[in-house]
Swiss-Prot record:
Tagged with keyword Isomerase: yes
PROSITE patterns attached to this UniProt entry: CHAPERONINS_CPN60
Binding site residues for ATP: 30-33, 51, 87-91, 413, 477-479, 493
InterPro entries cross-referenced by the UniProt entry: Chaperonin_Cpn60_CS, Cpn60/GroEL, Cpn60/GroEL/TCP-1, GroEL-like_apical_dom_sf, GROEL-like_equatorial_sf, TCP-1-like_intermed_sf
Protein name per Swiss-Prot or TrEMBL: Chaperonin GroEL
EC number(s) recorded for this UniProt protein: 5.6.1.7
Localization: Cytoplasm
GO terms, biological process: protein refolding
Amino acid sequence: MAAKDVKFGDSARKKMLVGVNVLADAVKATLGPKGRNVVLAKSFGAPTITKDGVSVAKEIELKDAFENMGAQLVKEVASKANDAAGDGTTTATVLAQSIVNEGLKAVAAGMNPMDLKRGIDKATAAVVAELKNLSKPCADSKAIAQVGTISANSDSSIGEIIAEAMEKVGKEGVITVEEGSGLENELSVVEGMQFDRGYLSPYFVNKPDTMVAELEGPLLLLVDKKISTSRAAASTERASAGRPLLIVAEDVEGEALATLVVNNMRGIVKVAAVKAPGFGDRRKAMLQDIAVLTGGQVISEEIGVSLETATLEHLGNAKRVILSKENTTIIDGAGADTEIEARVKQIRAQIEETSSDYDREKLQERLAKLAGGVAVIKVGAGTEVEMKEKKARVEDALHATRAAVEEGVVPGGGVALVRALNAIVDLKGDNEDQNVGIALLRRAVESPLRQITANAGDEPSVVANKVKQGSGNFGYNAATGEYGDMIEMGILDPAKVTRSALQAAASIGGLMITTEAMIADAPSDAPAGGGMPDMGGMGGMGGMM
């Protein structure tokens, strides 16, 4: 086992504090409408330019092991805030830096670290409760656009496109962000249910100009196994009774596919085949989703129905189906609203229960396909570097707007935290050390407002005092240098983002204050480099001149 280096007390905390400040100083430069950019070098390719706090935090790794521990703990604050609300990473980092700096001063002055932490926790709980009281529901498109704009570093085009996407697909809908090919952001909305499987043969195409297969008023045959014999293919065609038919199966191959293609080309029956989406159990669940949406039934031997015994009653109906090389879209399925609602309810319950982020994401996609729709935002930019930076901002703004819809909005620009101070003005702890912890958090919650002001080139103390003297939504617009009603000026933050940032900062900050020892691998003494190897036998080379 490698030797360890151990540090105790103040010497450990001082080292940790250096790391905290290095990371936080790099991250906090990006805060607010006048935040600066940070350039990140890459091991290959062009450097990346970003104003995203978590992207900056992820890049930082320090040489000194003890300083690095401090930096990594603050990185954890940014990640926690990002996981909880998808945004607010810079605010969380600024809050954590303030809590740790003030807390370690108090510990050095002889305060009890455990009581300080209890005071911080008590004050945090009171501020969080007050933030919930301050929050207003975010229902209309205008408020959603404002939240998106603020989160995307005051880019109104991003806020507006997200609001438009949410309006089109609803709160449950899936909105994905992709790299576009033009200079402008584009929004495309998919009607009905779309899944990422295309036609199994180009011979199904009946619109050569767009290379898609389009079926009007088709029946849908859903099968949870492979179809490989021509007899099975004939059974499927017989079941459709001459109407256009879409076959969704685990696979259609060999003779069966050849039979379907020939019959389609001869005009005997209008047919197209596609692989079922997903794999394993997820494939079965998605087939069932399609069945519910179209009012059909999955042909499965598990429930005693085979292809040979399938009848018209087992088939689903839709107004139209469009198959491209990559995707299949089912428009206006004929499923009963009550059954779709029951299925949606079931998926929501599974989302609540699952602990896997991957499963949750897949379940949310399924939910959106049944309940809402799918919108794709294609990000446009002049260069690849700008594209990556812009895409990260769009993703941030999307998370922020979802959080706003979930828990409402509060005045932005650090004002909500300052207003929430009212909850801890008269708060008292069980002893004097706890009171110091409460006072410490009281100062810390002003730090985002002060940092936004400093980044805008104004005097933080003057602005903080003026905002504290005001009430309600009165605050400071760093973009214009004006004071006024933050909500009217369109400066909103999602309550969930502000709450998550404070909770993550107080949690990690409190743990760092109570640190008494730090253990890291001792630096290894590298052996000195040797000289040149012996060149014996080459002495006669001089005579070659």
